[in-house]
Amino acid sequence: PMTDQKTYTQTPWSLKDLYDSFDDPKYQETFDEIKRGVENFQAYREQLSPDISEDLFIGMITTYEHFYRLMSRLDGFVQLAFAQDTQDQEAQAAVAKVDQFQAEMSNRTLFFNLWWKGLDDKNAQRLLDASGDFRYWLVTMRNFKDFTLSEPEEKVINIKDVTGVRALNMLYDSI
């Protein structure tokens, strides 16, 4: 038996759950909120020590998680907008802006990753035991400690990736 065939008109997906547009004030405000979060996080640098309290440590990584989620939202928005139309100049510029912003923010919080990877196993285990849902992320980060460079070198790599690998990938995606 034949069934009735229906025709559907393809429409672009809506990104309004993230932001209304690149001109959306909330989109612009997210950059500022991330900057404030990173500045607050940087204040923890002086408090990092092997005997840091579990509560302070959890507070730190909760702060980190908050601005990281915001960064993921920004990145998701620009990447989806770009995927919608790889020839869209505004989307291309937004991807480049967010990539650069991510590298800058990553460089400003890199101290934590390096401290965590360099922490002795006994204190790392103590903090892992208190870390709850953050445990997997923290364990994964420590797995890369043998492949981690100094802070200045890691910062150069972050910036290089924006103009190197990521820029090349974007070029290929545009073609």
Residues of each region from the PLM?
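A well-structured
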Residues: 2-175
